[in-house]
């Protein structure tokens, strides 16, 4: 009696491309540096990497009656990082912030702000306060 062969139609998963893994690790490191900067400035981190179908917010932090939604950008230079937050990305962050506020109504009356923290090798992170606003 012949033994039946089992063939799988599922493709084996490929490991992530080294460039993507490196970019992911760079992003995590930049977010950790940004969170440390915010904590040193007196902020309390409320959430990291908050994801919605509409977008993602890297860090949500609070200081007194202010909630700030922070986009972290890591690039080869701080100038390159400064230009990396596009209007489309800003809108996605604003949409994600609205989703977060719907699930955290206790913060709805707080002052809200959209900041960016720029990270580059051999440089201190740069905190751009009110990098953009919800009217853009």
Curated annotation (Swiss-Prot):
Signal peptide: none annotated. Pfam families: UPF0102. It comes from the Bacteria. GO terms for molecular function: nucleic acid binding. InterPro entries: Restrct_endonuc-II-like, tRNA_endonuc-like_dom_sf, UPF0102_YraN-like. Disulfide bonds: none annotated. Belongs to the UPF0102 family. This is UPF0102 protein BBta_0181. PANTHER family: UPF0102 PROTEIN YRAN. Gene3D superfamilies: 3.40.1350.10.
